[in-house]
C-alpha cells in the first residue's frame, strides 16, 4: 500500500490509549482541546482472495519516546507510539502524495490534545425481556 501511494485518512473524535499507573492499565480517551474531530494518517489496500474482495486499512504511528504528551501511554517498558495526525491544511496533500514525499508528514501528534480517564463502560445485564426484543 505504501509503495502504491494508497494513502487514506481516518476521521476520529477520540482515540484510546492505555496509561499504566502502579502497574495497572487505565483506559484514556485522547481528543483535541477544542473538541473538533481530527484525521489520522492511514494506508488502505484492496485485494482479491479467491472470489472474495478484502478491504483493509491501517493507522500510521511513529515513535514517541520523547513526546511530552504521548510518553505517558503504553507499558513503561514498551516503545512509546503516537498516531500521525494530518492537519486540515495537509489532508488533500496526504491523499495525493507520492510515497517518497510522504515522510515529511509522518510526525507525532502536535500540541492541542487532552487525555481523560475513560473506564470501559460496563455491559448491561441481559434480561429475558431484552433478549426477546433484541434477538
Predicted regions and their residues:
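A structured binding-face within diverse protein domains that lines the active/interaction site
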Residues: 1-135
Amino acid at each position: 500500500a505504501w509503495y502504491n501511494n494508497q494513502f487514506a485518512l481516518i476521521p476520529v473524535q477520540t482515540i484510546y490509549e492505555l496509561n499504566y499507573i502502579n502497574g495497572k492499565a487505565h483506559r484514556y480517551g485522547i481528543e483535541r482541546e477544542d473538541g473538533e474531530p481530527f484525521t489520522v494518517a492511514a494506508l488502505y489496500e484492496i485485494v482479491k482472495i479467491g472470489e472474495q474482495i478484502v478491504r483493509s486499512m491501517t493507522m500510521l504511528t511513529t515513535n514517541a519516546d520523547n513526546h511530552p504528551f504521548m510518553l505517558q501511554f503504553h507499558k513503561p517498558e514498551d516503545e512509546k507510539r503516537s498516531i500521525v495526525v494530518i492537519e486540515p491544511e495537509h489532508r488533500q496533500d496526504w491523499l495525493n502524495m507520492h510515497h517518497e514525499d510522504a515522510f515529511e508528514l509522518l510526525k507525532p501528534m502536535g500540541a492541542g490534545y487532552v487525555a481523560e480517564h475513560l473506564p470501559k463502560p460496563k455491559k448491561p445485564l441481559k434480561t429475558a425481556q431484552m433478549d426477546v426484543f433484541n434477538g
